[in-house]
Each structure stands twice: as C-alpha cells, then as structure tokens.
C-alpha cells in the first residue's frame, strides 16, 4: 500500500515496477527485520528522467548488523540498466539520532516521499529545525566554493563545466527548497518553480 506526501508527484508505473523488482530480493534477505521502503528525492518531481537520474530509495530495517548486511549484499541486483536505484539503508534508531544533525535532508524526505512497501515509520517523526539555518549556510558556502574551484580548473573545458553543473543541480534544488522553508514558505513540487521562488 502506498502513502503519498503533499509535495509528491507520482512516479511512472514503469519506475515503480522496476523499483519494486529491485527491492524484492532485498526485502526477502532482510526478512523480519524489514520495516519500510520509501521513494524520495527527484524521482517524485516533475521532469524526472530515469535514463539520467538516480532513483533514491530509503530502506528502513530494525537492525543492520554484519550478518544482515552480508545477506543483503549477496542479493543486491547488479543490473545497470535504467532506472538506476540508489539505496540508503538505515535503522529506526539511526533515523531518530540523525534528525537534528541532517535537518535539510530529513525535512525534504518528510515532505516528499512515497511509501512503496511496509509500514509508515516516518509519520511519527518531527524534524527539529534549530540547526536548519546553520546547515543550510554551511552547505551553500561549500557548494559555491566547489563551483568556483571547478570553474578555475576547467574554464577552457566547457563540457566538463557542464557536467559539474548537472551533477550539482539536484543538491542545489534541495538547498533552495530548504531556503524557502527557512523563509516560512512551502516549496512547490516542481523544481523550476522552486528556483523561481528563490530568485524573487
């Protein structure tokens, strides 16, 4: 049964089917430890291109000890055809302990996720916003420094610069959504509208 967040745009049936197909052996390996699997990130935005972008998949487990990790590793699909699944494995305790450390990421996931398997374990969490401004400023400064260094190193190589910008686009979109939240605004689901709102 699927659960949809307010900001979510439904992924294509093909993407959902491919993700569930990837997840099936992983869920089987986790057995009773498996709790939930969520799509999150750009796959739930308008204009997502599965040929180029990765499908972010959060998998929540009761435990992730070494035996469990070995069981999961042995069944991880090796098919490199699109869509490309990017899994993040966490326990409930790890989520609880990281909410205040990574407010940007968790607020974004809380507002833009789709439960595709298991029970909803994210619904009861509240993300503290006390560190949001600090993390946002730190990451924006880091991104700007990285882009400046890339420009200086590759000014004569426009294709390299284009690749750097493309690789940075998704993370900048996440930061822009966080900037809107810091201003007390609700970010739209469409990335283009997010950028327009930040530019106003």
Kindly give the residue locations of the regions a language model identified.
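A charged, well-structured terminal subsegment
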Residues: 114-116
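Extended, charge-rich low-complexity interaction segments
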Residues: 119-127
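Short gly/ser-rich loop at a beta-strand->alpha-helix junction or flexible surface loop bordering the NTP-binding
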Residues: 35-43
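Conserved nucleotidyltransferase catalytic core and NTase-mimicking acidic/glycine-rich helix/loop elements
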Residues: 126, 131-200
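Metal-dependent nucleotidyltransferase catalytic core
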Residues: 6-28, 45-52, 57-102
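Serine residues within intrinsically disordered or low-complexity segments
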Residues: 2-3
């Amino acid at each position: 049964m699927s659960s949809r967040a307010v900001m979510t745009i439904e992924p294509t049936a093909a993407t959902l089917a491919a993700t569930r197909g990837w997840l099936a052996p992983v869920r089987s390996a986790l057995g009773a430890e498996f709790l939930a699997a969520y799509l999150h990130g750009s796959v739930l935005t308008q204009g997502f291109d599965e040929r180029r972008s990765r499908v972010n998949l959060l998998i929540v487990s009761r435990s992730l000890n070494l035996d469990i990790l070995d069981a999961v590793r042995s069944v991880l699909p090796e098919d490199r055809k699109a869509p490309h699944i990017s899994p993040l494995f966490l326990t409930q305790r790890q989520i609880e302990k990281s909410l205040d450390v990574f407010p940007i990421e968790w607020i974004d996931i809380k507002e833009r996720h789709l439960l595709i398997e298991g029970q909803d374990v994210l619904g009861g969490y509240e993300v503290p916003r006390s560190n949001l401004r600090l993390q946002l400023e730190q990451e924006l400064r880091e991104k700007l420094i990285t882009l400046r260094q890339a420009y200086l190193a590759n000014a004569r190589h426009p294709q390299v610069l284009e690749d750097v910008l493309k690789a940075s686009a998704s993370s900048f979109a996440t930061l822009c959504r966080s900037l809107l939240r810091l201003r007390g605004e609700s970010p739209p689901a469409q990335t283009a509208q997010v950028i327009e709102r930040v530019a106003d």
